[in-house]
């Protein structure tokens, strides 16, 4: 029965039916016949509503008669069935009050705007007349009745309420369902709607009425007063309730979508008067510089690891006369430098732990004592100087070249690997051999990808940060930013990318913020792309000789903050691997099913029959750039990492809203002729998410490029079609 229901009814109808059952604590899996009855009942209500319309003067039209006049028509019937029970009652009372009629004692299924009458719809396995009189006895004249039977008969209290076509459609659908059920031997197990209705009607006496009035919560004098308050309150269901009331006034005109109707999103990202989007990731990525120290591969305490790395690069460790290269707007460079020196001294001193003294500059950097003071509501009301702070709307920014550069650098191969994955036991079943082979190819490609090194740095740092935040809530702690890499020869190196300072971390809630000051090494001169670094204060602290060449070393300092949720996600950053690998594995599986054998090796390297697979991985000078299967895997993995690193509400909103546009473009490509309404509203929903998130702005830029290419392609196809027609 479950499969039958899924196959024969729309998903929205099934979901509403399940919600209705949930309100009565009924289980759809245990009572599939009840679920079926509710689905049929809902569908009949929608069929009746979809077939009948009214114009502004109240004249009735069928769906066929109303073609071409859709702008001036509205549904004749309001569908109440399928709404959550409390909202349905609110809508029913509102409609009764609006049209000056008495509210029925029972919930109706439909409301007729022409006759201003509520309607009960019934479906029965027996005779329609028998069920009609059962309903009539229960409901009296409080509402009209529309009863339909699987036996191809019907009974209406008002014959003019439904035309012949409407009756025919309902009865045809019931016949079709009965035939399908009989074919699958399910007809006999189905119980009729009339058999599951159980109820006892009784008159509300004076005693019970008094008890009801006494039982209302404090603040209400009687039951009717409480009901009136509930009807007018603005709870979470306010949107649904108001929409239900507005439905007769709403006119939606679908329009067939053409390529010309689609425009680029976020035009402000090309506005050169706006500032470039700044770098705001928690840690440096492609600009990082790790101080390497060869190790035997044994595990070490973070402090020991950092101390050994600093000892190897003593000129950087002992630097006391830095050169200020760049200063962020609110930074105090003297305080930041003194805090850095305290961090170095703490790490270098074997006798102390990694706790910092609470100096005035440490308090400034960690924001100690700058938290908002909570004021009780009663006090705030009496104080005229107290007011609600205006919400801060993010400033709009334009696209910056550094985002694409980060993407390119992170998806390249390096000579070191940092990926730390658990070992898997030996294969047992044949399918495990395929899995191991596939995993080997995937991991080899990802292992030496720059993005995997950055990912592991995030994982290790957030793990240490969360541990310290929980273990030392009232202390300032130095946390080394470290990683361990292995080169192609199998030699292990400890890497120190910088140091961080954790402020006080009494994190009661998941969103409570802990201040983190980061000090990171880099060989990138910030003046080369100054628009990227407005959030950083940068010092030049010396130089290193790499391959016989002197490279300057800069210290990037930033006051930042995070919370438990973000730290937990940082610890789980390895999930980025899953999404990218699953995406590529789906392609391998598809190829394997076509060829009839495992195509893992063929996709990566090719075989005697097939060349290695290639994919479009970007554009260059307006043309698509192809890349190998492995390169495509690394690009998708890097995108997953960037999605995590720059993830916020803007990105969530953009991903959800832009998906609709992508589906429309795909439908146009497939020549399915999509219809839309309120396209500008969809664009508004997308564009309000494009503010100052680097990944969102870059994604919008890529979307516009892709849209341009698809539009050009559609013109070529149209010209080919014209030639073929001639």
Curated annotation (Swiss-Prot):
It comes from the Viruses. Keywords: Cap snatching, Endonuclease, Eukaryotic host gene expression shutoff by virus, Eukaryotic host transcription shutoff by virus, Host cytoplasm, Host gene expression shutoff by virus, Host nucleus, Host-virus interaction, Hydrolase, Inhibition of host RNA polymerase II by virus, Manganese, Metal-binding, Nuclease, Phosphoprotein. Phosphorylated on serines and threonines by host kinases, including human casein kinase II. Mn(2+) 2 binds at residues 81, 109. Disulfide bonds: none annotated. Binds 2 manganese ions per subunit. A motif (Nuclear localization signal 1 (NLS1)) lies at residues 125-140. A motif (Nuclear localization signal 2 (NLS2)) lies at residues 183-244. Pfam families: Flu_PA. It is found in: Host cytoplasm; Host nucleus. Its cofactor is Mn(2+). The keyword Ribonucleoprotein does not apply. Its EC number is 3.1.-.-. GO terms for biological process: cap snatching; DNA-templated transcription; symbiont-mediated suppression of host gene expression; symbiont-mediated suppression of host mRNA transcription via inhibition of RNA polymerase II activity; viral RNA genome replication; viral translational frameshifting. GO terms for molecular function: endonuclease activity; metal ion binding; RNA binding. GO terms for cellular component: host cell cytoplasm; host cell nucleus. Mn(2+) 1 binds at residues 41, 109, 120-121. Belongs to the influenza viruses PA family. Plays an essential role in viral RNA transcription and replication by forming the heterotrimeric polymerase complex together with PB1 and PB2 subunits. The complex transcribes viral mRNAs by using a unique mechanism called cap-snatching. It consists in the hijacking and cleavage of host capped pre-mRNAs. These short capped RNAs are then used as primers for viral mRNAs. The PB2 subunit is responsible for the binding of the 5' cap of cellular pre-mRNAs which are subsequently cleaved after 10-13 nucleotides by the PA subunit that carries the endonuclease activity. Influenza RNA polymerase is composed of three subunits: PB1, PB2 and PA. Interacts (via C-terminus) with PB1 (via N-terminus). This is Polymerase acidic protein. It comes from Influenza B virus (strain B/Lee/1940).
């Amino acid at each position: 029965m479950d499969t039958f229901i899924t196959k024969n009814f729309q998903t929205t109808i099934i979901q509403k039916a399940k919600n209705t059952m949930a309100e009565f604590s009924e289980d759809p899996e245990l009572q599939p016949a009840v679920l079926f009855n509710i689905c049929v009942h809902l569908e009949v209500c929608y069929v009746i509503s979809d077939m009948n319309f009214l114009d502004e003067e109240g004249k009735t039209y069928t769906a066929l008669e109303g073609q071409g006049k859709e702008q001036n028509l509205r549904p004749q019937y309001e569908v109440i069935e399928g709404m959550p029970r409390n909202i349905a009652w609110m809508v029913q009372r509102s409609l009764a009050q609006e049209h000056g009629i008495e509210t029925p004692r029972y919930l109706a299924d439909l409301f007729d705007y022409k006759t201003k009458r509520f309607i009960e719809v019934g479906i029965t396995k027996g005779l329609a007349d028998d069920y009609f009189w059962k309903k009539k006895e229960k409901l009296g004249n409080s509402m009209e009745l529309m009863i339909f039977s699987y036996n191809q008969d019907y009974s209406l209290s008002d014959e003019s309420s439904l035309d012949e076509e409407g009756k025919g459609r309902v009865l045809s659908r019931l016949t079709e369902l009965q035939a399908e059920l009989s074919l699958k031997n399910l007809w006999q197990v189905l119980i009729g709607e009339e058999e599951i209705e159980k109820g006892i009607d009784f008159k509300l006496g004076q005693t019970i009425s008094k008890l009801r009035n006494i039982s209302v919560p404090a603040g209400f004098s009687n039951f009717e007063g409480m009901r009136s308050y509930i009807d007018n309150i603005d709870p979470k269901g306010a949107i649904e309730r108001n929409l239900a009331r507005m439905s007769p006034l709403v006119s939606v005109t679908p329009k067939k979508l053409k390529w010309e109707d689609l425009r680029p999103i976020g035009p402000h990202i090309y506005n050169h008067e706006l500032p470039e989007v700044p770098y705001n990731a928690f840690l440096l990525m492609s600009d990082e510089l790790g101080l390497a120290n060869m190790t035997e591969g044994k595990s070490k305490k973070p402090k020991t690891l950092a101390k050994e790395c600093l000892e190897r690069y003593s000129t950087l460790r002992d630097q006391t006369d830095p050169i200020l290269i760049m200063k962020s707007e609110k930074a105090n460079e003297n305080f930041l430098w003194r805090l850095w020196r305290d961090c170095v001294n703490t790490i270098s001193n074997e006798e102390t732990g990694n706790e910092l003294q609470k100096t005035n500059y440490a308090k400034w950097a960690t924001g100690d004592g700058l938290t908002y003071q909570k004021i009780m509501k009663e006090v705030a009301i009496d104080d005229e100087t107290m007011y609600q702070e205006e919400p801060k709307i993010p400033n709009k920014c334009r696209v910056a070249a550094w985002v694409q550069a980060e993407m390119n650098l992170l998806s390249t191969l390096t000579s070191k690997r940092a990926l730390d994955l658990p070992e898997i036991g030996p294969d047992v079943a044949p399918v495990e051999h395929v899995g191991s082979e596939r995993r080997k190819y995937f991991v080899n490609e990802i292992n030496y990808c720059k993005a995997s090194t950055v990912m592991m740095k995030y994982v290790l740092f957030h793990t240490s940060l969360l541990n310290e935040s929980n273990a030392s809530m009232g202390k300032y702690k130095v946390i080394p930013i470290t990683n361990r890499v292995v080169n192609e020869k199998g030699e292990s190196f400890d890497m120190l990318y910088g140091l961080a300072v954790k402020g006080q971390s009494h994190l009661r809630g998941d969103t409570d913020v802990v201040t983190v000051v980061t000090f990171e090494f880099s060989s990138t001169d910030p003046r080369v792309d100054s628009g990227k670094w407005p959030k950083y204060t940068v010092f030049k602290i010396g130089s290193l000789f790499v391959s016989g060449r002197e490279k300057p070393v800069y210290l990037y300092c930033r006051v930042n903050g995070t919370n438990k949720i973000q730290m937990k996600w940082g610890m789980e950053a390895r999930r980025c691997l899953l999404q990218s690998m699953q995406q590529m594995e789906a392609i391998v599986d598809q190829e394997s099913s076509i060829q009839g054998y495992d195509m893992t090796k063929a996709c990566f390297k090719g075989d005697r029959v097939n060349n290695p697979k290639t994919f479009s991985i970007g554009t260059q000078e307006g043309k698509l750039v192809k890349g190998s299967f492995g390169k495509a895997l690394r690009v998708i993995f890097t995108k997953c990492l960037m999605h995590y690193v720059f993830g916020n509400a803007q990105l969530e909103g953009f991903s959800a809203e832009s998906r609709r546009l992508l589906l429309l473009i795909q439908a146009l490509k497939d020549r399915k002729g999509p219809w839309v309404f309120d396209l500008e509203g969809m664009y508004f929903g997308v564009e309000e998410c494009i503010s100052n998130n680097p990944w969102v702005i870059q994604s919008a830029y890529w979307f516009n490029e892709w849209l341009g290419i698809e539009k050009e392609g559609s013109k070529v196809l149209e010209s080919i079609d014209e030639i073929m027609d001639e």
